[in-house]
């Protein structure tokens, strides 16, 4: 009886293991890759003027990584053309940028190097300008990110500190601290947003916040720098405490059938209203 009981217990154990193993294991499906709207070209016009003021075109490699861009200023004589070339590795992204070559004091293009950590987030942004007598090197560093990978503070070379506020996936405020005539001061940027999702690359929000002409490089690296907002920018207000001055820009969009902004109307409290026409890599 004892032997039979042992056999029955063993059989029961085997049966329960088999029953458990027969249950299919359904793997968790991978999260869908985020949709990206790759920009091929941005053209800028003064509203009411058919003559183009500025153009920037972007080129990508086979992996859809940005490989180069060309800026054109059609209203200059001769027409000014500025090229930027990018190279990528796991450790850094480097931009060779000819922005300063129109000035005779520079002997070669500027270099912007974005160092990356093991997670692919920015750890340092260094820019180098080459003069006949040497180099001028500046660095932005001490990046700190929240749990969502959004930048919350940094140490730029041109300010003492930067603090960023996020709400519902959008960067709503940036405070830059600095000293002016021995007194602590601040520049405060506040942003509001539309309900339209921002899928643009380069990041249209950062491009518009600095406004053309001339790229400021961060629109190229918003994901690595933790600067991408979920929605498209509606307004951008800049206030300086030392002067009390405030400027404001507002943005209105026309979208195509895919929900991509193809035209942006910019109203500027200090400048001429402008229109940006956007062309995408994929039609």
Locate predicted features.
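Sec-dependent signal peptide recognition
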Residues: 2-7
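Buried hydrophobic residues that stabilize the cores of well-folded domains
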Residues: 20-283
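C-terminal motif of bacterial Sec signal peptides marking the signal peptidase cleavage site
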Residues: 14-16
């Amino acid at each position: 009886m004892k032997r039979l009981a042992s056999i029955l217990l063993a059989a029961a154990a085997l049966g329960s293991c088999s029953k458990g193993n027969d249950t299919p294991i359904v793997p968790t499906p991978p999260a869908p890759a985020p949709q990206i709207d790759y920009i091929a070209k941005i053209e800028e016009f003064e509203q009411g003027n058919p003559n183009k003021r500025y153009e920037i075109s972007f080129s990508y490699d086979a992996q859809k990584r940005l490989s180069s861009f060309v800026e054109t200023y059609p209203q200059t004589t001769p027409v000014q053309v500025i090229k930027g070339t990018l190279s990528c590795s796991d450790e850094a992204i480097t931009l060779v940028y000819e922005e300063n070559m129109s000035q005779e004091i520079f002997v070669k293009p500027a270099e912007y190097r974005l160092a990356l950590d093991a997670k692919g987030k920015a750890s340092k942004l260094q820019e180098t300008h080459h003069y006949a007598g040497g180099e001028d090197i500046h660095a932005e560093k001490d990046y700190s990110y929240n749990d969502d990978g959004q930048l919350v503070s940094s140490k730029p070379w041109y300010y003492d500190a930067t603090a960023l506020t996020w709400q519902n996936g959008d960067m709503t405020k940036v405070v830059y601290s600095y000293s002016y005539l021995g007194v602590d001061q601040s520049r405060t940027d506040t942003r509001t947003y539309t309900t339209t999702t921002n899928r643009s690359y380069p990041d249209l929000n950062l491009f518009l916040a600095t406004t053309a002409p001339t790229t400021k490089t961060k629109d190229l690296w918003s994901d690595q720098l933790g600067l991408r907002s979920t929605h498209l920018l509606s307004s951008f207000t800049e206030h300086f405490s030392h002067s009390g001055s405030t400027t404001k820009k507002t943005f209105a969009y026309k979208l195509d059938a895919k929900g991509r902004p193809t035209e942006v109307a910019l109203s500027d409290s200090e400048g001429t209203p402008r229109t940006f026409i956007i062309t995408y890599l994929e039609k």
